[in-house]
Amino acid sequence: GHRLVCVVWIVLVVMASMIYGFNVEERKLQDMTATLLGILYVVFFSFHIVLIDQTADSDLIWLVFLAAFGTDIMAYFVGMAIGKHKLCPHLSPKKSKEGAVGGVLGSVLFCGIFAYFVKPDMIAECMVIAVVGSVVAQFGDLAASAFKRQMGIKDYGNLIPGHGGILDRFDSVLFTAPMIYYCILFVNEM
């Protein structure tokens, strides 16, 4: 059902993008590719949030947001407080290795509190998902930074002053959702 809808939607987006690309004579292949990847990035990754909601453990949908936001929040504060060693200066000069570790701890803290109150029988699983989710969130954030640098932009928008657009706030969520979905499937198979 819902997986077929996702596949059909992706095929339609790819076809529409190709038709559009062939009809615009001056369209650069790089621009067309970036547009297509951007659409697939948002649609495919965000659809995993819907897939998590369809699982037997739909409460675990919160792990996507807690892992990503716990990572972002704690990485920021730990990085500001004690960050000395640059994580990946050519992509994101303000990120530090200390902040990255703080991000993992933040994800574990947020997801651990959630598990304690909502899924006490799954605390260990939620902690593992928190670590995996945090690492993926940070790679996702760096991948989004690389994409923005390639396109020559600082932020995806300017809706939130100093923070960019909505997509800038949710890029780590988008990367985290598929990984957490597959972690949930793996845990449910055990």
Where are these regions (language model features)?
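A short, terminal or domain-edge coil/loop segment
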Residues: 35-43, 118, 143-150, 179-181
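Membrane-embedded alpha-helical bundles of polytopic integral membrane proteins
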Residues: 1-131
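Acidic (Asp/Glu-rich) catalytic motifs at the cytosolic membrane interface
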Residues: 68-84, 88, 97, 101, ...
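Juxtamembrane boundary at the C-terminal end of a transmembrane helix
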Residues: 182-190
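Juxtamembrane helix-loop transition sites at the ends of transmembrane segments
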Residues: 93, 120, 162, 173, ...
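Hydrophobic transmembrane alpha-helices of multi-pass small-molecule transporters
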Residues: 107-108, 169, 176, 185
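A general structural signal for short secondary-structure boundary/capping elements
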Residues: 110-112, 178-181
